[in-house]
Amino acid sequence: VEEDEIITNDAVSEGDVLIGLPSSGIHSNGYSLVRKIVFDVSKADLEKVYEGLDKPLKEELLTPTRIYKDAVFALKDKVKIHGMCHITGGGFYENIPRMIPDGLFAEIDTKDIKRPAIFDLLQEWANINTKEMYSTFNMGVGFIFAVAKDDKDAALEALKAAGENPVVLGEIEKGQGDKCIIKGL
């Protein structure tokens, strides 16, 4: 990558729109907790296809982590990407703040996220509150872009043309304090 093409997140600004891309499941993070829930707490049957899953639990747990490079390239050719983050261990609350400059925060609305059933099962089995789930797992969103509000439609179109199913998650707003606020939590 040429130095002038590096996306540093420095361009993230008030009013930017946050666009999320679906995860393929748990991804490669949170497995210490997942193992504890599956083997110690729930004593789940790895061969069983639980409600909401379309394959046995063991296959769901081993679903490979998505790589988002094609989406990044498709989007950067159409609009200026102000920021991006991969939702890994630490969920929304640790990863989104990494792309947000001081004096700004992300306000997230989860209503349009297609939450994979594996997260519902883990939450039910371990009786974990929803805020903690968003603090630990990707909850169905594996990658997030920040783009200018004026570029929102072009960004969504470019991502859809690249075979993605993007969802608008929220906006960057001005304010001090928590860098990630999820409505309703």
Where are these regions (language model features)?
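Glycine-/charge-enriched secondary-structure boundary and capping motifs
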Residues: A44-E47, E51-L185
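Glycine-rich anion-binding loops of enzyme active sites
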Residues: V1-Y31, E171, K183-L185
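Short, compositionally biased
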Residues: Y31-S42
